Amino acid sequence: MPAQEQELFGLPQVLINFRTIGTTAIKRSAMGIVAMILHNEEKDEIKNYTIRDVSDIPETGLTADNVDLIKKCLLGTPLRILVYTLPMSTVDGATHTQANVLRMLANIKWNWLCAPTATTQEQQDLASWIKTQRPTKRKTFKAVLAEQDADHEGIVNFCTNDIKVQTDTDVLGNPVYTIYTAVQYTARIAGILAGLALDRSATYFKLTEVESVEVYEDIDTLIDKGEMLLIDEQDGDGVKIARACNSLTTFTTDKGEEFRKIKIIESMDMIRDDIRDTFKKYYVGKVINDYNHKMLFVSAVLVYFSEIKGNVLDADADNTVDINEQYQSNYAKLHGDDPTTMSAMEIRQYNTGDTVALAGSIRLVDAMENLTIDFTL
């Protein structure tokens, strides 16, 4: 009995934590972490750096081009950048590869991945890795890659080239420009997406440092193909992100058209991480897995849902979570019991060992992006 009382006494912490993470959701959503992979080393080795601002960039050890890419990422104000440096392509017989870095990244916390010095093959390998990590490992990793037709909600396919940016002035005070490729500017885009709060979309986000970009004949068709592009509409507003879309173009009943919106995927990932992290911190190994404790956890999740209504969840929708009765029924059948002879409550209360199976329905809110007006005069 004392142990049971102690467990029950500790449960209010879960409610407090869910309420806290709910009220801080927008602020926390603007503090994403970027993982950046760079070819930099002249020896067969991997180094890593944690960069929170420009003062963290080492004075030696990184090439000038790589320092520039890190600074471009910092413009988006991510919480921090986890920089991993690989051998340059000129290092003969190098054994340290991108695969080694991915093994390091697999079990740490970050949000957006970019590799602005990667080869086409390395970009393809990153796309394959993200596609594996999200469904099978239940990770919320995402990547900004260049010209990768990945058809996946976790991968942004950035395709704008000829990105003209003033990077210096000459002795006469005239501007000196650098032309960036799409793969190089994935660093900038990853920084933007990591530092952007969920109270807005990245659509029409201004890149004030960019002077001009390539021009498209039919940008709508390209966006429909899952390409994220920069555009200058020559309206005096400068260069901006045309549409905050990921590379998903194949839609199903499980993944509808809303899954192509970066804001929607970011919201889903934040909810998954918040619930999973709280479960690990307050429940795993600490709470008896009976019906009452399951329902206490359900109540805590509902409190969290109530706190993120508005900018994350649709305030007018019925956002719910409950015991997964289908899982409970299947579990009972697998363990030799006949669920057809059981009442609904008996199925809900069936002992599922160390597993908590919940089912829910939520409606995520998007930012305004399209305007349709029909005037009748």
Spans of model-derived segments:
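Structured, hydrophobic secondary-structure cores that serve as assembly/anchoring elements
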Residues: 1-69, 74-78, 200, 227, ...
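Short, surface-exposed beta-edge/turn micro-motifs
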Residues: 31-33, 109-111, 140-141, 225-228
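Extracellular Cys-Trp
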Residues: 66-204
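Long, low-complexity, intrinsically disordered N-terminal extensions of eukaryotic proteins, enriched
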Residues: 170, 210-213, 238
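Acidic, serine/threonine- and glycine-rich low-complexity intrinsically disordered segments
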Residues: 205-222
